[in-house]
């Protein structure tokens, strides 16, 4: 994400979306009641005869919406903002309209910016926080390919070696297997991490070096699925390599919370967490991105800011966020035990 213009007097930022991950940040920055301005398209009104003979032409218009709803699925390639037009061509004012945001879109946002929204904006525009890594979790039989986004893990492919199992082939070749993996990796990031048990991982790393593939590390893991990626994230090597990644920070704080619960130093659920907040007893508030966008979430964040509690927003697109979601979307680590 890039900030193109900053108008602090009017609480407005104009930004450009530069990657799919920016759409996740934008989803969490936007709230109902915000105002956004961007170019959208509408169909030219034509007579019924003309409509039957050809598809209606779409022309670009610039509109300003008051946000009512945001539609976005994780790892999707677009975000839709729906609302009422407050500025635009005369015949559009007061009508419902949508703006579709994709990579390379430019959009202006006017809102009441609190600290968390500003932090998200800064994180989205800082390259050290938004690196996407490619992980290959593999053994002699298969390789699963994952993208490690700042907010979650996305599986994007699987390559079978044909050595054994239902995909077994009589003409198995390890070189052919490795070549298929390398070809699959061409579509993704150059920052490649190889994970897995046994020696196939190391042989593949050497093969990549011979082919000029940019492998930044080969690390042991007990599995060849997404569990291998989470195992790596929690390892010392993963913590060092991914220290700036949101997903690694999510994992670290949720692990601390789980330890705190065992020691009777953790609370969870909206009511327990807010009660501890109001007493000033929470050192850390952990809230899912889903709850961050709710009135209850905003209230808890406001209290946390007032009493000096550290705030952590975790994504439900990854395992740590799913853990917090199962605890009701709100969790906290206590400064001291409460009754």
UniProtKB/Swiss-Prot annotation:
Changing residue 22 to A: No effect. Strongly reduced ribonuclease activity. InterPro entries: eFR1_2_sf, eRF1_1_Pelota, eRF1_3, Pelota/DOM34_N, Pelota_arc, Ribosomal_eL30-like_sf, Transl-rel_pelota. Changing residue 21 to A: No effect. Strongly reduced ribonuclease activity. Keywords: Cytoplasm, Endonuclease, Hydrolase, Metal-binding, Nuclease. One of its GO terms (cellular component) is cytoplasm. It comes from the Archaea. GO terms for biological process: nonfunctional rRNA decay; nuclear-transcribed mRNA catabolic process, no-go decay; nuclear-transcribed mRNA catabolic process, non-stop decay; ribosome disassembly; RNA surveillance. Its main location: cytoplasm. Monomer. This is Protein pelota homolog.
